[in-house]
Amino acid sequence: MTADTAVSIPPYQVDDQDVIAELRARLGDDGFTLQATRTGMPVLWVSRERLLEVLKCLRHLPRPYVMLYDLHGVDERLRTQRRGLPDADFTVFYHLMSLERNSDLMVKVALSERDLNLPTATGIWPNANWYEREVWDLYGITFQGHPHLTRIMMPPTWEGHPLRKDYPARATEFDPFSLTLAKQQLEEEAARFRPEDWGMKRGGEHEDYMFLNLGPNHPSAHGAFRIILQLDGEEIVDCVPEIGYHHRGAEKMAERQSWHSFIPYTDRIDYLGGVMNNLPYVLAVEKLAGIKVPDRVDFIRVMLAEFFRITSHLLFLGTYIQDVGAMTPVFFTFTDRQRAYKVIEAITGFRLHPAWYRIGGVAHDLPRGWDKLVKEFVDWLPRRLDEYEKAALKNSILKARTIGVAQYNTKEALEWGTTGAGLRATGCDFDLRKARPYSGYEHFEFEVPLAANGDAYDRCMVRVEEMRQSIRIIDQCLKNMPEGPYKADHPLTTPPPKERTLQHIETLITHFLQVSWGPVMPAGEALQMIEATKGINSYYLTSDGSTMSYRTRIRTPSFAHLQQIPSVIRGSMVADLIAYLGSIDFVMADVDR
C-alpha cells in the first residue's frame, strides 16, 4: 500500500548536535547542562523553573519534537556512581521524538525529596496525562495543574509508592495479606465510578446519560481492562479507560534480578511477542557492556523476531475479524500460528516464551534441518494471506463495520504517542527497522506498508502487508545466513562460551561468577528502541556498576495507544468502539507491565 500523505523521514541522527546549538541560541549557555550517556541522544538537565520553557521551545522549534515518547522517574537516593550529575533525590525524564529530524532528545529534572513537585506538561503534549499519573502513583511526585492526578497502576486504596527504593521488592517483606469483609467492601466502594470526579455530567438538557461498564471482564476488552462509557442512547458522549488490573511490577522486579536472569521476565511484557521482547533488552545491555555481536547472531535474532511478528499479527487478524462478527477465520489463523510455532519450537525449544536471546548472542546455534522448516513456512504462508484477504478482508460486512471507523490523522497520532501500524495507517512512513536500523536490519530489503485513512480497516490491512514483508525478511535470512559463532567473544557475554572453561582457569572463574552472581555491567545509561509487534518498545537501563539494574524503564506501545481511545471514539457508537479496540492490537500485559 502507498499513501499520498506520507511523511519524509531523514537519515537517523545519533546525538544530534544541531538541536543543542538551537537551544543555546534560544535559552543561553546557562539554560541546561549536558550528560554523556549511551542512549544515542542528547541528554539535558534543566532546572524545575525552566522546565516548561525548555519543553515548549522543543515542541515549537522549526523542526519540532512533536511526540512525547516517554516520561518517567528515577529514585536516585541509593545511586553511588553519580560523577558529573547534579544532586538529586529523584529525577523525572522526558524522552522526546522528532520525525522531521529523525532524532530524539531527553530532558531531565533533578528533585529534592523535600519538594517533589513539577508543573504538568499536559498543556504541551496531551499524552503526558497518563505518564504523569504513573510517576505520581509509583514515585509520589506531584504534577501541579494536572487535570486528574490519581492512581493508574495501583488500586485507589494502595498505600505507598512502589518504585521508591525504600519500598519492599518481595512479597515476603510484607505482612501476610488477608481480605476481610470490611476490606472487600472498601475496595468495592473505591472502584465505584463517580462521573463528577472526571468532570462528567449525569445528564443533558433533556435526558439522563447512562454510564456503562465495559469490562474489566469482557471478551471485546482483550484482557483485564475497564472502560466506563458515558452514553446518550448508543452514542458515546465520553469514556474513561481504566488500566492497572494486570500490573505485575515488572520494572521493580528488574531491580532484584541479575542482568541475565531478567530475560525471561521480558517475555511476559507483550506475551504474544516472544523473543521480540528480549531484543530491546539485550541490545540495551550490550550497549552498556560494549558488546558487538557476530553477524550470525544479528541474522538469527532478526529471523526469530519476524517469526513472532507473524504469529502476533495472525492472532490479531483472527480476533479482529471475530470482534466484528465473523467466527470462522480465528480458527484458521490459530492453525496457521501453529505452523509458525513448529519452526520456533524446533529452533528455540519453546513456543510462546522462549527467553532465548542472551547478552552477547543467543542460547544455542541453529539446529540441523532448520533451513528446511523455515523454507516450508516461507513457501506456504503467502498463499494463506491471499486467501484471508479474498475471503474475509474484502467482505462487504467487515468493510462496512470498519472503513471510516475510529479514524485519526498523523498529527493526532503523534500527539498521543501512537506508533507502529496505528501510525503508519495514517500515511506516516516511520518504521524503526528502516528509519533507525538495529540488529542488522540495514542488510535486508523490505517495504514499509502504509495506508492513508487511519481508520480501523487500514490498521488491519497494514498488518496483513507487514506479514508479507516479514516473510521477505525471513527468506533473506534463510538464503544469506552467515557462518560464525552464535555468541560474542567478550568477557560480559552471558553465559560465556563454555568451550575454553576446561583449559583456562580465568574463563572458568568468569563462567562461574556470571552464572552464579551474574555479570557486572559498567555504570552508565543505555536505551534501545525497536519496532515491536504492536509499535515501538524500548528499554532504558541505568547501571550503578552492579550485577543488577539500578533502574529499568520499560516503555510499551500499548500504554500510549489505550490513552488515545477517548479522543478517537467520542461521538461514535458502541459497536464502533468494539471495532476500534480490535484494530488497536493490544494485550494488557503490555499496557500494565
UniProtKB/Swiss-Prot annotation:
- What does the record say about its membrane topology? Peripheral membrane protein
Q: Does the keyword Translocase apply?
A: yes
The record ties this protein, via Pfam families, to: Complex1_30kDa, Complex1_49kDa
Where does the record say this protein resides? Cell inner membrane
Q: Which InterPro entries match?
A: NADH_DH_suC, NADH_DH_suCD, NADH_Q_OxRdtase_suD, NADH_quin_OxRdtase_su_C/D-like, NADH_UbQ_OxRdtase_30kDa_su, NADH_UbQ_OxRdtase_49kDa_CS, NDH1_su_D/H, NiFe-Hase_large
In residue numbers, the region (NADH dehydrogenase I subunit C) covers 1-184
Mind telling me what this protein is named?
NADH-quinone oxidoreductase subunit C/D
Identify the HAMAP family for this entry. Answer: NDH1_NuoC (MF_01357), NDH1_NuoCD_1 (MF_01359), NDH1_NuoD (MF_01358)
